[in-house]
Amino acid sequence: MPELPEVETSRRGIEPHLVGATILHAVVRNGRLRWPVSEEIYRLSDQPVLSVQRRAKYLLLELPEGWIIIHLGMSGSLRILTEGLPPEKHDHVDLVMSNGKVLRYTDPRRFGAWLWAKELEGHNVLAHLGPEPLSDDFNGEYLHQKCAKKKTAIKPWLMDNKLVVGVGNIYASESLFAAGIHPDRLASSLSLAECELLARVIKAVLLRSIEQGGTTLKDFLQSDGKPGYFAQELQVYGRKGEPCRVCGTPIVATKHAQRATFYCRQCQK
């Protein structure tokens, strides 16, 4: 599933081609995504794009009359193409732009979303979200406070959007390795110093992935059609049985709430 770095990479890739241009019309080939494509998107016409923003894993296209909210789901990606290129099997939505470009949404598993909001404030998919991990609001003191009475393992707690947004399976595993914290540790057992370290490495891991264009494991592509290159730097995720790059101990894989967790028994305590 595309996580925060992949969504931010998509935002940065499409923004220069959309902001200042006008959506002439939308082409919806298959509106049966995780939620049905909003009716307002079918009717888009002559709408200039004012900004391209991100909240958590949602892309937000600001138009004069409202917002397009896009979620990439499990396998979605956005590409900027030249108008006239024929669609392929899993190309479900196009935004045809006034500058001769097309924003094309591809999603083999159709678990993404294209929604419309007159106002963002209070929209159900954006309500109750925690802070952005790259913001000043997410820090060691905040994390320690939220972990203090939490009798659950730290790994799934990091992936809870009420705590912090956008830290999915890949980056939770990688951040815990970088901090030397075992994913099964109770959140309440973390000291303030450990929370401060963990908050710092989460930011560092996410920023490094954004620099590398995100992580491509299967479906994700950047807006120019290229894969994300952070997969080449993964320390534990997807490396079951391979030697730890630090100590040589074989990487272990377990399941947490049906999600794979990867860690080093020697480096993480």
Curated annotation (Swiss-Prot):
PANTHER family: FORMAMIDOPYRIMIDINE-DNA GLYCOSYLASE. This is Formamidopyrimidine-DNA glycosylase. The active site is at residues 2-3, 57, 259. Keywords: DNA damage, DNA repair, DNA-binding, Glycosidase, Hydrolase, Lyase, Metal-binding, Multifunctional enzyme, Zinc, Zinc-finger. Monomer. Binds 1 zinc ion per subunit. It comes from Shigella dysenteriae serotype 1 (strain Sd197). The gene is mutM. GO terms for biological process: base-excision repair. Its EC number is 3.2.2.23, 4.2.99.18. It comes from the Bacteria. InterPro entries: DNA_glyclase/AP_lyase_DNA-bd, DNA_glyclase_Znf_dom_DNA_BS, Formamido-pyr_DNA_Glyclase, FPG_cat, MutM-like_N-ter, Ribosomal_uS13-like_H2TH, Znf_DNA_glyclase/AP_lyase, Znf_FPG/IleRS. A zinc finger (FPG-type) spans 235-269. Involved in base excision repair of DNA damaged by oxidation or by mutagenic agents. Acts as a DNA glycosylase that recognizes and removes damaged bases. Has a preference for oxidized purines, such as 7,8-dihydro-8-oxoguanine (8-oxoG). Has AP (apurinic/apyrimidinic) lyase activity and introduces nicks in the DNA strand. Cleaves the DNA backbone by beta-delta elimination to generate a single-strand break at the site of the removed base with both 3'- and 5'-phosphates. Belongs to the FPG family. Disulfide bonds: none annotated. The keyword Cell membrane does not apply. CDD domains: EcFpg-like_N (cd08966). DNA binds at residues 90, 109, 150.
